[in-house]
């Protein structure tokens, strides 16, 4: 259900019924590129990076929603095109520093660990300057130290940049530790929603995520 939710919000799957409203605007039937222009960005459960490109080049791709190409900028590159290019690069360099990627900025993505690749995906999403950020299992495949780093970066992005974050995760300790509200899904069905302490105490959530035996033991 979570992948369907993400794809419905971002315009890849049209919902069969209901509406998707973002900041008062109905985006239900909106094309993905138009959703992105409404300051929605995402990361992917399965890494969607260009392995043959450097970390910096992958991150720069996130600026595509802000590009405004024109014949004039091409013809008068030194006066019109270059200043815009420098401005985009400045945003990327700031995010690289924010996510502590300076040491690998020029490395090919394929040479990085899973944890660093996930951080590059987050950087690419953040350079789009989103108001709504969707993170699809950003900690999958990470060790505990990498998870803690990523959790800290997500919290900093939310608090310092005023971003609303939709975090999709199976690690309940991470979810309960950093989320303000939780919605638990079981095969597309909402089985619990509310504050973290309310959701983890919900019998249906306990049964779905821990199993009946663990529920009775608790």
Name the predicted role of every residue range:
Residues 3-218:
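Glycine-rich phosphate-binding loops of nucleotide-dependent enzymes
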